[in-house]
Every structure is written in structure tokens, then in C-alpha cells.
């Protein structure tokens, strides 16, 4: 899937490159899609990458923190855009996100048992406000921020087993706030919008082990999502 996503982005990028120089950076660019942003509602889709991690807080000083190794995941989803004012839009961007984090727990004596692979498939539902600057030629930068709700399809929330049998458990539903920036690039037939966004979990997502003195979860006060999303949106 990652290779397919890279291929799609590469082909799209090569196809756009010929237009990009003449239509965006020339001295007198042809203004594309001049009235596109005046639509009350418009739709799109996105492809992208993510890097998810966790922020741990501890009950007592652990000496050595839980080590979080982040990997690159992928995103795909839809975009619905509602124009509120000239420079303000409301956006809904439901998407499917896949990611993996490798956690190493220093309090576990057995080196092999320290590692937990946390693979997650998320249904992600952000509701965002988009603040756009004045359009210059075929470019229009913007800021975006808001709240999101995430459904973790691989949370193991209802599992009876815990880390002592290799099962890492998380809460199924989480809430986040998000903040980022991007730029709208107007081509002849479509608008392309690369963006980068940070995701910050609001509540503890960890389900503790059955043993309150577990070396995995006993000293953890909270575990919250931290993520970076890079999306390439086509309208």
C-alpha cells in the first residue's frame, strides 16, 4: 500500500510539474480556477503519510522513560469544504489512517519482553476551521485548526489479557486538537493542497494491566497521542 501511494504521488507530481513552472512562478501567470473558492460547498480527497507517537507522564520519576520508536504510516480520506466567509472555511476530513509504534519498557527485566508493537488502524474524523490568506496568482497559503475524534479499530479495549500475555490495550475512542498549515495551488483543472498538521491527544488512552504493579503500566499516569500528518489533497 505504501508503494502504491508513493507511485500515485510520483505520477501526479510529474504530471503537474510541467504546468507548475509556467502557471505558478512565471512573471504573469494565467489565473486558474478564478472562481473556485466562491463555491458554497466543494469536495475532494487526500492521500498522505503520518508519524504517530505517544507522550507519557509518570506517577513517579521512572529514571528511564518508555522509548517510543515511530514509523511512517499512510492516510487516505475525503474532504468536504463549506465556505463561511471570504477567508474562512469549515472542513470535514474523514479518513483511514494506519500506523505503528514500537514501545520499549525499561522496567521489564527480560529484554525480549520489553518490546510491544502497537499497530493501529484509525478512523479519524476532524472538524477544522481553515483560515486562508489573500490569493496571490495561483497560490494561497492557509492555517487550519480544530478538533477531531478518532476510533481505534485495533485498540484491544475489551481484551481480558494484558501485557503479561503480550496484549497492549488502549481506549477505543479518543479526542484530539489539531493545528497546521498548507498552501492551495491552482492548476487548470483542479486545486492541489499539500499540508502538514500536528495532532495532540486530550485524554489518557492507556488501559492498565490487571496487576496494578505491572512493570508495563504501573507507573504510567497518562499516555496521549502525538502525531504529524502530511496530506496531499486534490479538489
What label would you give each PLM region?
Residues 54-68, 99-120, 151-171, 206-221:
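Flexible, solvent-exposed loop segments that connect beta-strands
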Residues 73-83:
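A short, N-terminal amphipathic alpha-helix
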Residues 19-72, 235:
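Short glycine/proline- and aromatic-enriched beta-strand/turn motifs that initiate or cap beta-hairpins
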Residues 37-41, 49-55, 81-156, 231-235:
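Gram-negative (and chloroplast) outer-membrane scaffold detector with strong preference
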Residues 28-29, 77-78, 126-131, 179-181:
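Short, well-ordered amphipathic alpha-helices
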Residues 1-26, 232-235:
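Bacterial Sec-dependent N-terminal signal peptides
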Residues 174, 182-235:
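Predominantly the C-terminal beta-signal and adjacent terminal strand-loop region
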Residues 39-41, 70-74, 119-125, 139, ...:
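Residues that define the transmembrane beta-barrel architecture of outer-membrane proteins
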Amino acid at each position: 500500500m505504501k508503494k502504491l501511494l508513493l507511485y500515485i504521488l510520483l505520477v501526479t507530481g510529474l504530471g503537474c510539474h510541467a504546468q507548475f513552472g509556467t502557471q505558478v512562478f512565471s512573471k504573469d501567470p494565467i489565473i486558474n480556477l478564478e472562481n473556485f473558492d466562491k463555491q458554497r460547498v466543494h469536495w475532494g480527497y487526500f492521500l498522505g503519510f503520518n508519524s504517530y507517537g505517544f507522550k507519557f507522564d509518570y506517577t513517579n520519576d521512572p529514571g528511564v522513560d518508555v522509548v517510543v520508536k515511530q514509523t511512517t504510516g499512510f492516510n487516505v480520506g475525503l474532504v468536504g469544504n463549506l465556505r463561511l466567509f471570504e477567508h474562512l472555511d469549515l472542513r470535514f476530513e474523514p479518513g483511514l489512517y494506519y500506523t505503528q509504534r514500537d514501545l520499549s519498557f525499561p522496567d521489564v527485566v527480560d529484554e525480549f519482553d520489553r518490546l510491544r508493537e502497537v499497530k493501529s488502524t484509525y478512523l479519524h474524523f476532524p472538524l477544522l476551521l481553515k483560515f486562508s490568506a489573500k490569493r496571490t496568482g495561483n497560490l494561497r497559503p492557509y492555517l487550519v485548526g480544530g478538533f477531531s475524534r478518532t476510533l481505534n479499530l485495533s485498540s484491544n479495549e475489551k481484551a481480558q489479557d494484558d501485557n503479561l500475555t503480550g496484549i497492549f490495550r488502549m481506549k477505543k475512542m479518543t479526542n484530539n486538537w489539531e493545528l497546521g498549515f498548507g498552501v492551495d495551488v491552482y492548476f487548470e483543472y483542479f486545486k492541489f493542497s499539500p499540508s502538514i498538521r500536528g495532532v495532540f491527544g486530550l485524554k489518557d488512552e492507556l488501559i492498565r494491566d490487571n496487576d496494578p504493579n505491572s512493570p508495563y503500566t504501573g507507573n504510567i499516569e497518562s499516555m496521549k497521542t502525538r502525531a504529524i500528518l502530511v496530506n496531499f489533497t486534490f479538489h
